[in-house]
From Swiss-Prot:
Its main location: secreted. It comes from Oxyuranus scutellatus scutellatus (Australian taipan). The keyword Secreted applies. This is Short neurotoxin 1. Keywords: Acetylcholine receptor inhibiting toxin, Disulfide bond, Ion channel impairing toxin, Neurotoxin, Postsynaptic neurotoxin, Secreted, Signal, Toxin. Residues 1-21 form the signal peptide. SUPFAM superfamilies: Snake toxin-like. It holds the Pfam family Toxin_cobra-type. GO terms for molecular function: acetylcholine receptor inhibitor activity; ion channel regulator activity; toxin activity.
Length: 83
């Protein structure tokens, strides 16, 4: 019985990949590339793009936020996928 419980715990840890943290780009527009380590179990990165009087604005970060009409949003689920 103990062996079965230990096996289940090991399988759970392997399947859940406990301790994994997502890394996303977080630079804005044309700034130099920077990254951030996401917290709180966040498992996606985003890139939002929109235009205003100054030109095209790009925002990057962790998560997958909702956006207003006229803002293009791309969400992805691998490290540094939001370039």
């Amino acid at each position: 019985m103990k062996t079965l419980l230990l096996t289940l715990v090991v399988v759970t840890i392997v399947c859940l990949d406990l301790g994994y943290t997502m890394t996303c780009y977080n630079q804005q527009s044309s700034e130099a590339k920077t990254t951030t380590t996401c917290s709180g179990g966040v498992s996606s990165c985003y890139k939002k793009t929109w235009s205003d009087g100054r030109g095209t604005i790009i925002e990057r970060g962790c998560g997958c936020p909702s956006v207003k009409k006229g803002i293009e949003r791309i969400c992805c689920r691998t490290d540094k996928c939001n370039n």
